[in-house]
Amino acid sequence: MIEQTLDIATGDGEMETFICRPERGPFPAVFLLMDAPGIREELKDMARRLGTVGYYVLLPNLYYRAGRDTIYGPSVLEEGSAERGRMRAVRSKMSIPPVMNDIAGMLAFADRQKEVRRGPAGFVMATA
């Protein structure tokens, strides 16, 4: 299994993205979009599980526009915590059109990777 964190070019800058994939390839790409609490170890574990069954998984930090300090601690899941308040302040500034542009950047990136095989993609983003 290969794991790496890369910056993917978007219209608004460089989007930090966790990538997990088996060796060799090509493999179908999965865009694993974070939920409201953002990137955390549980989501990386989901990416790893998908990678072990033959997918090239991209897990982008969709909060990258607010800076690199948008990876929150475990208390982000606790109502009333300072981390949750920080996350909500960033999340409240998000809108769909920029995220769709981020997806376009991810598609362009995936299209350039020899380890990625073209195929359908699915998207989900929940809220906290």
What are the language-model segments listed below?
Residues 1-128:
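N-terminal cap/leader regions of alpha/beta-hydrolase-fold enzymes
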